[in-house]
């Protein structure tokens, strides 16, 4: 919808050639073509003057000739009389099922001069006397070498000079195929650019009046492009992070980014993991029967959630549209052979499940009472959402679920992997209801919208964060059924040696990385009074974060320009929990010794009350804590003494602190020591401190869990961030040149020993105490 709006504004501004680059498969291109035809091109331009009552001619018209549901329902935009409205006609150079083809003799379809559209042929196309009479050309094109070569070739053959045509190139999935993946240090001269990157660069080179706008959900690859490469596609002028509407279910909807107590972790009212995530622990190597049992539980969830949807629609008919589709995604491999085998396995399990029998109903009743009923009752998911009181309410709808799933050929499974084009017709969400189980890989992991996705069975490991993010198809809008979503996630995939991968943890890490990245992009979104960007990315390329050592932000081939010098975002709290393993406790002793003088010298003041906004309820709450003011030089010495896990580099942060100090933007630090209800006072080597519980992460990630959201607002308010509701006490510490540190101490005994502070002895040693901090630089 956003880039449809951008195109509409571009047309109003006089752009007359619109090229939309989609993903690399036809399925994605046709989806985008349809969306633009429906929202922008409109009925009149699609009909092209054909009388919709002329049955012979209308048969060849997209949508109208195929009795498309949305076309018949009037959902395609209508512009009325274009000439009377003074609006340009839109010529479609591509169709619903046809990518770009060489125009040959029909070049006037692309050429305003050959089409005799110019009022003043002696003046350029862009001249005001001509531009408003000129038709708009729009091509929705796959990022495919053959297709793009045809388009470039036709553009070079038209009569109009390319530098006189105002053009807009919209690149959807801009991190895919567009980025040059050949390292210039290694590539031979004749292969210095990848084919798609070269063709896009050639397009931009020909279209002097062309503008390039890229869209992507995973922008990591794009910011690794070299800013100095004049022909590459670096986002040099602006980067805008589009805010998701409240109804969108993103990473935070399914993960617990804040530290939770043991009781909170088991409560679906508080914990998103408890509400939505179901662990997959079995492997075919060790126990194939248990793998079948886990997969059967996922199938049961799919059937039961479908029955609940149908029951809700019977109670509230307004929900029927939201439940037109109901799908389950199964994703565990990129191999087409594996997809076929998995589809057969699911088919066998479906038959063995015996849906509709008393035995199956007994399983579904247990699942409803033990899972779905509790999760639905735990929160106010949506206003007025019908809630089934018992399994008996939804049981009568199970038969209808089976009819919908098996309505075509009796097979509940569809494989989508590019092997057979006819498979796609079985999931044509526009033409018919789709209640199916979808098995696939790349075709389902990038761009293709899975309507009604409710149950996900996910076991595929990827080594790049952007690839893994694209597989997260459960993010999106779930009207009327957000409480029914279930993610069956592999929690113990074996890697090389003793390496074990937790996919849920991996998704959580990249979602947190993305949040940090988006927070940084806010800097690049700001504009000056004249509309110019306050900061251009080409001047300060944005940083990409990486929490998991094994999960790179993007492919190595897209990262050859990556080199981090310094990093830091003013007014944003950043956690630094990546400390080494406890070992013999010597690192803990060293870290505690660095901050010990602050307590010995009684630098912390009296207890004060700070505020925060609870992200779950929106209410303003408070906590207590004490503050110490530490000079910039002393803090620099303390921070320089901390040790980190292998692979984590703290030096860019130190260089940013040095730079802020040298520029006079950082004079001192306010160190906030929270005193929370969950803490317990302990005496550590003679120093009395509040001790908290923090979870030690496993070896693949290292360090501790992050800070709580409860202290974030106060820290950011101290640094001068005006929209952080930290309370009057926090704002009183703001000087405009003050950084803030959140300092906590966590029990860190030997593995297997008690970690709960309230159960530990009053006197402890520094070896059993972790010193953990988070930082925020001055906002100004």
Locate the predicted segments by residue.
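Walker A/P-loop NTP-binding motif
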Residues: 2-15, 26, 35
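Conserved RecA-like ASCE P-loop NTPase motor core of nucleic-acid helicases/translocases
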Residues: 16-24, 326-333
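Conserved P-loop NTPase catalytic core
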Residues: 44-73, 77-85, 165-171, 175, ...
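Conserved C-terminal RecA-like helicase domain
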Residues: 45-123, 154-161, 165-186, 191, ...
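C-terminal catalytic or substrate-handling cores of phosphate/nucleotide-
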Residues: 142, 283-320, 326, 333-337, ...
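A short beta-strand element within the Helicase C-terminal
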Residues: 436-439, 446-460, 485-486
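C-terminal accessory/interaction regions of large nucleic acid-associated machines
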Residues: 462-482, 612-780
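Conserved segment of the helicase C-terminal RecA-like domain
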Residues: 476-507
């Amino acid at each position: 919808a956003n880039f449809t709006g951008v195109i509409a504004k571009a047309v109003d501004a006089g752009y007359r050639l619109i090229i939309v680059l989609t993903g690399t498969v036809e399925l994605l291109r046709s989806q985008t073509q349809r969306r633009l035809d429906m929202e922008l091109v409109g009925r009149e331009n699609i009909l092209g003057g054909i009388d919709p009552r002329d049955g012979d001619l209308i048969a060849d018209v997209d949508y109208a000739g195929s009795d498309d549901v949305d076309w018949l329902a009037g959902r395609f935009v209508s512009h009325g009389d274009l000439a009377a409205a003074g609006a340009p006609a839109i010529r479609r150079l591509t169709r619903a099922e046809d990518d770009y083809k060489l125009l040959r003799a029909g070049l006037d379809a692309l050429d305003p001069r050959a089409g005799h559209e110019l009022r003043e042929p002696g003046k350029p196309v862009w001249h005001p006397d001509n531009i408003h009479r000129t038709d708009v050309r729009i091509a929705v094109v796959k990022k495919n070498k053959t297709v793009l070569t045809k388009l470039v070739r036709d553009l070079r053959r038209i009569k109009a000079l390319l530098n006189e045509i105002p053009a807009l190139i919209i690149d959807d999935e801009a991190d895919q195929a567009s980025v040059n993946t050949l390292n210039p240090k290694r590539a031979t001269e004749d292969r210095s650019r990848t084919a798609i990157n070269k063709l896009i660069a050639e397009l931009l080179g020909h279209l002097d009046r062309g503008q390039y706008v890229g869209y992507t959900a995973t922008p990591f690859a794009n910011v690794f492009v070299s800013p100095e490469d004049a022909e590459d596609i670096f986002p040099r002028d602006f980067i805008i992070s589009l805010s998701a509407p409240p109804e969108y279910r993103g990473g935070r909807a399914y993960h617990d980014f804040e530290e939770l107590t043991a009781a909170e972790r088991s409560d679906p009212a508080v914990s998103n993991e408890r509400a939505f995530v179901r662990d997959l622990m079995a492997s075919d190597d060790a126990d194939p029967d248990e793998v079948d049992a886990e997969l059967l539980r996922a199938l049961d969830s799919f059937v039961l959630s479908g029955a609940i949807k149908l029951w809700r629609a019977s109670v509230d008919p307004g929900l029927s549209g939201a439940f037109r589709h109901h799908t389950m995604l199964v994703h565990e491999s990129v191999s087409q052979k594996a997809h076929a085998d998995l589809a057969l396995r699911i088919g066998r399990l479906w038959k063995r499940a015996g849906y509709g029998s008393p035995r199956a109903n007994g399983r579904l009743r247990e699942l409803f009472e033990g899972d779905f009923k509790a999760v639905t009752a735990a929160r106010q998911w949506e206003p007025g959402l019908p809630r089934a009181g018992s399994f008996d309410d939804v049981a009568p709808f199970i038969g209808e679920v089976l009819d919908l799933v098996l309505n075509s050929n009796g097979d509940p499974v569809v494989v989508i992997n590019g092997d057979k084009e006819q498979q796609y017709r079985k999931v044509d969400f526009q033409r018919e209801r789709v209640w199916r189980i979808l098995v696939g890989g790349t075709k389902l992991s990038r761009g293709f919208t899975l309507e009604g996705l409710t149950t996900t069975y996910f076991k595929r490991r990827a080594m790049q964060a952007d690839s893994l993010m694209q597989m997260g198809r459960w993010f999106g809008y779930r009207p009327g059924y957000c409480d029914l979503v279930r993610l069956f996630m592999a929690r113990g995939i074996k890697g090389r040696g003793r390496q074990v991968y937790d996919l849920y943890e991996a998704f959580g890490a990249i979602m947190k990385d993305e949040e940090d990245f988006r927070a940084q992009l806010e800097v690049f979104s700001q504009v000056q009074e004249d509309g110019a960007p306050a900061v251009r990315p080409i001047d300060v390329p944005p940083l990409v974060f990486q929490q998991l050592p094994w999960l790179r932000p993007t492919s190595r081939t897209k990262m050859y320009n990556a080199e981090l010098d310094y990093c830091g975002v003013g007014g944003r709290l950043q956690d630094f929990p990546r400390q080494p393993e406890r070992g013999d406790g010597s690192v803990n002793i060293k870290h505690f010794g660095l901050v010990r003088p602050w307590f010995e010298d009684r630098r912390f003041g009296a207890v004060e009350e700070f505020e925060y906004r609870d992200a779950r309820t929106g209410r303003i709450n408070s906590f207590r804590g004490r503050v110490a003011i530490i000079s910039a030089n002393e803090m620099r010495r303390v921070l320089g003494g901390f040790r980190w896990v292998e692979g984590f580099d703290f030096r860019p942060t130190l260089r940013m602190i040095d730079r802020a100090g040298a520029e006079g933007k950082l004079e001192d630090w306010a160190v906030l020591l929270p005193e929370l209800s969950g803490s317990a006072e302990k005496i550590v080597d003679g120093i009395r401190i509040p001790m908290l519980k923090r979870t030690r992460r496993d070896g693949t990630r290292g360090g501790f869990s992050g800070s709580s959201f409860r202290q974030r607002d106060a820290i950011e308010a101290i640094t001068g961030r005006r929209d952080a509701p930290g309370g009057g006490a926090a704002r009183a510490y703001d000087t405009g040149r003050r950084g803030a540190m959140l300092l906590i101490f966590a029990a860190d005994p030997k593995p297997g020993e008690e970690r709960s502070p309230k159960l530990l002895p009053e006197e402890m040693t520094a070896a059993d105490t972790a010193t953990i901090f988070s930082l925020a630089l001055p906002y100004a």
